[in-house]
Curated annotation (Swiss-Prot):
Enzyme class, UniProt record, top EC level: translocase
Name of the protein: NADH-quinone oxidoreductase subunit B
Binding-site residues for [4Fe-4S] cluster, renumbered to this chain: 36-37, 101, 131
Subcellular location: Cell inner membrane
EC number(s) per entry: 7.1.1.-
Pfam families, per database record: Oxidored_q6 (PF01058)
GO molecular function, one term: 4 iron, 4 sulfur cluster binding
Keywords carried by this UniProt record: 4Fe-4S, Cell inner membrane, Cell membrane, Iron, Iron-sulfur, Membrane, Metal-binding, NAD, Quinone, Translocase, Transport, Ubiquinone
SUPFAM superfamilies to which the protein is assigned, alphabetical: HydA/Nqo6-like
Length: 158
């Protein structure tokens, strides 16, 4: 009816739902353990919280991953390497910023060598607060990322 009105067809809407459902069940993160938050990230991947039940398998290579978890303090010298890892990931890709230091610099905010948030280097989809955030907080952040992926239009033109 109006200029901004978009009608997605049945096939497009169904394919979007199917593709996004499949993506949420097979998130493969590459990890950047920059500080103490990495310990909690490993804790989340261990037996008690078992991220495998969500279809999350940690990958050693960014070329095999679709989620980047930035866990810890990002220093100025590490920023180009983080950007390179992000650029090597295939599309679609998502980023989780884990911990106060990755979110905004944390305790080291006023240090000369710290990037005040990894969102200055790469686009961030989900922020997990805390110093360090618990494994439950990371699991909750991953569930929020899955909800964000489900709501995304994959094939429909905008």
């Amino acid at each position: 009816m109006g200029i901004g009105n978009e009608n997605k067809g049945f096939i497009t809407a169904s394919a979007d739902a199917l593709i996004n459902w499949v993506r949420t069940g097979s998130l493969w993160p590459v990890t950047t353990g920059l500080a103490c938050c990495a310990v909690e990230m490993m804790h989340a991947g261990a037996a008690r919280y078992d991220l495998d039940r969500f279809g999350i398998v940690f990958r050693p290579s960014p070329r095999q991953s679709d989620v980047l978890i930035v866990a810890g303090t990002l220093c100025n010298k590490m920023a180009p390497a983080l950007r390179q890892v992000y650029d090597q990931m295939p599309d679609p890709k998502w980023v989780i910023s884990m911990g106060s230091c990755a979110n905004g610099g944390g305790y080291y905010h006023y240090s000369y060598s710290v990037v005040r948030g990894c969102d200055r280097i790469i686009p961030v989809d989900i922020y997990v607060p805390g110093c360090p955030p618990t494994a439950e907080a990371l699991v909750y952040g991953i569930i929020q990322l899955q909800n964000k992926i489900i709501r995304k239009d994959t094939i429909a033109r905008k």
